[in-house]
Each structure stands twice: as structure tokens, then as C-alpha cells.
A protein has these predicted regions:
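Acidic, glycine/proline-rich low-complexity segments that act as flexible tails and inter-domain linkers
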Residues: 1-62, 115-132
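Short alpha-helical linear motifs
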Residues: 85-92, 108, 119-128
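Short, structured motif recognition centered on aromatic/hydrophobic residues
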Residues: 63-71, 100
């Protein structure tokens, strides 16, 4: 009974994650929602409500560009790819994304630069686009 209540409560949280994802696929959210609905609810509060779902001084596109730089510097391929997809959906140009990747090379080193450049190429190719 309690599990059904948790699943119903998290239905709205799942939809909020999907909206915040801007079409970028990340099935890990569904797993966390299934395995630990209570934690998923807290995660939604931090990630969706507090970071990417709220309006603040920085536009969402700028936040995504920052996340690209951070995930490159930390060498997180999945995060780099997801945030590139989201930035593109928010009308970031490939040049803006590349500059976020290049800035990340200072604190993160060349492996982050290579990761970001390759990820940008791969995402653009998957979308049938070219770097311009």
C-alpha cells in the first residue's frame, strides 16, 4: 500500500524530470524512482525545482553551458552528452558549446577538452547537423 502511494506521488516528479531533461534521454531517473521513491522525491527537489526548473538570474541555456564545462572538467561522458543535447535544444550554437568545452580545459585538462569535442561531434552527427 505504501509503495503504491510512493509511486503515485512520484508520477508528478517523473514528469517534472522529463520536462527538465528537454528531450535528452536518461533512463537512470526511472530506475531511481522505482528503487527508492522517497530519495527520488528529494532529488527532484534539488535538481528540477532548485537548479534547472527554476527561473533565476542565469537563463537555462547558460546553466546548461556551465554544466557542459563542469562535466567536461570532471570527465563525465554521460553528463557531457546530456547537457550538450539540452543546450542545443535551448538554441545554444555549436560554437557556444565548444567555447564552454574549451574553458573547461583550463581546470580539467586536455582529456576534458577531447571528451567535450568528441561528444559535441557525436551529438551533432546523431541530430544530422554539422559544426558551424
Amino acid at each position: 500500500m505504501a509503495r503504491n502511494k510512493d509511486m503515485n506521488r512520484n508520477a508528478g516528479s517523473r514528469e517534472a524530470f522529463k520536462r527538465a531533461a528537454l528531450g535528452a534521454k536518461n533512463n537512470a531517473y526511472e530506475l531511481i524512482a522505482e528503487f527508492d521513491p522517497e530519495y527520488f522525491s528529494y532529488l527532484k527537489g534539488l535538481y528540477v525545482d532548485g537548479t534547472f526548473g527554476s527561473q533565476g538570474a542565469l537563463p537555462r541555456k547558460t546553466r546548461e553551458l556551465i554544466m557542459i564545462g563542469i562535466t567536461c572538467a570532471l570527465n563525465r561522458p554521460r553528463g557531457v552528452r546530456l547537457h550538450i543535447q539540452r543546450a542545443l535544444s535551448l538554441k545554444a550554437t555549436p560554437r557556444e558549446i565548444l567555447e564552454a568545452v574549451e574553458v573547461a580545459a583550463i581546470p580539467g585538462g586536455l582529456p576534458g577538452l577531447w571528451l567535450g569535442a568528441e561528444s559535441l561531434r557525436d551529438v551533432l552527427k546523431a541530430q544530422g547537423r554539422k559544426f558551424q
